[in-house]
Amino acid sequence: MTKQLLTLRVNGEPRTIAADPHHTLLEVLREELGLTGTKHGCELGECGACTVLVDGVPILACLTLPTLVGDSEVTTVEGLASAEALHPLQIAFAEEGAAQCGYCTPGMLMTAKALLDTTARPTRAQIASAISGNLCRCTGYTAIYEAIEKAAASEGGAGASLRAQGPLPLPLRKAGGTNATGAQLP
């Protein structure tokens, strides 16, 4: 099949790629752009591991064709942190032990970011409702709820100097979508 030229805005930068028109946004992000923080999960839209933000709204990248988001801003877990600091959600997930195996964490972080962008101080019920489409088989969700509450309560300064202190501890790497060696999780 003939590849189609696509221009996407991903994590604040325009990216032009040639992709198969039947590929999903998940496949384009991972295989064409090398952004492997977004995970293959069920590929049926049931687990939330592939959640990214499109214009600030969480969507399932496994069910979305990239041609549908060409004029939108796509944010992946790699776009959460700045060059200087991790996002407060990433810090809170690490501190609260909400990133157990780390596989669901990128999708969970993106859903939580969308919630906090629209609801400054969400209730536990609002958090539970927001992340209800993100499955985690390791944590039991309490640590995830607490991490989101902690990030909501922060002033945005959490983790401001962590990037300059050398290699990140394992929980912080997992909260950013990488494994013990710093390589992206599959």
Language model segments and positions:
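Signature of N-terminal electron-transfer/Fe-S-associated modules in redox systems
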Residues: 1-163, 170-173, 179-186
